[in-house]
């Protein structure tokens, strides 16, 4: 007679399910091969414009020398050598900061400034596209508030850090890669905007299924599998 202990041991060695390997990101260009119609609809969506680079058509902010004075900071928006810049004058002096990305599409477009140690920071003055209640132009996101450097709410602080606070929702396949010992970010992403796999998940397994010969599908004529 087989003991209950032996049966338990045998059952523990039998896999209850077959787990597939985790999927990898393939990028939307691979998705377009079969889903061009969906891609055309996506291309006009806010997801497609969640992050914009300078020079893109939908990045409509004007860098024509306009200024905003708020919270003890004077901000001037202008072009230098063909690139958008923000001249910041505050209690620490004056500095010029290049714009790395535009963040969002409407009713406002915020700007991201590249800072040391791999950080991207959201600047507290945004561009209103004029599609909401506010007229078109630059405006302070925190009017009347003066936040000193070192405060987490300052634009260089942790609460305005793109890597930690924003990236996972505005880009696809984000890995923050924060090194606490060195206090640096080595953030990477698969695609800069909210692309197909941000919502549907990594697509390599789906692609493998889609290109698999139909005779390999369950229920197919087994004679064709010889």
Task: List each language-model region with its residue ranges.
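Flexible, active-site-adjacent loop/turn segments at secondary-structure boundaries
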Residues: 23, 40, 45-49, 61, ...
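Boundary at the C-terminal end of the N-terminal hydrophobic targeting segment
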Residues: 11, 18-23
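Short, structured protein-protein interaction patches enriched in aromatics and acidic/basic residues
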Residues: 58-77
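Extended surface/linker regions that mediate inter-domain or inter-protein docking
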Residues: 75-226
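Generic structural "secondary-structure junction" signal
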Residues: 27, 53, 65, 127, ...
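Mature N-terminal segment immediately following signal peptide/propeptide cleavage
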Residues: 21-56
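Bacterial N-terminal signal peptides
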Residues: 3-14
């Amino acid at each position: 007679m087989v003991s209950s202990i032996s049966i338990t041991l045998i059952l523990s060695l039998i896999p209850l399910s077959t787990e597939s390997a985790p999927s990898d990101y393939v990028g939307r260009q691979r998705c377009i091969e079969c889903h061009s119609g969906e891609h055309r609809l996506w291309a006009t969506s806010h997801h497609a414009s969640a992050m914009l680079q300078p020079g893109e058509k939908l990045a409509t902010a004007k860098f024509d020398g306009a200024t905003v004075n708020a919270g003890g900071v004077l901000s001037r928006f202008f072009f230098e050598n063909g690139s958008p810049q923000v001249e910041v004058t505050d209690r620490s002096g004056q500095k010029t900061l290049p714009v790395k990305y535009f963040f969002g599409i409407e009713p406002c477009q915020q700007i991201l400034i590249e800072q040391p140690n791999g950080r991207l920071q959201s600047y507290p003055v945004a561009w209103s596209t004029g599609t909401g209640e506010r007229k078109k132009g630059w405006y302070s996101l925190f009017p009347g508030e003066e936040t000193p450097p070192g405060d987490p709410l300052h634009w260089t602080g942790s609460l305005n850090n793109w890597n930690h606070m924003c990236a996972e929702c505005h880009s696809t396949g984000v890995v923050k890669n924060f090194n606490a010992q060195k206090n640096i970010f080595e953030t990477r992403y698969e695609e800069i905007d909210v692309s197909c796999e941000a919502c549907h998940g990594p697509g390599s397994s789906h692609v493998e299924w889609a290109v698999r010969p139909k005779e390999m599908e369950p229920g197919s004529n087994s004679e064709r599998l010889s």
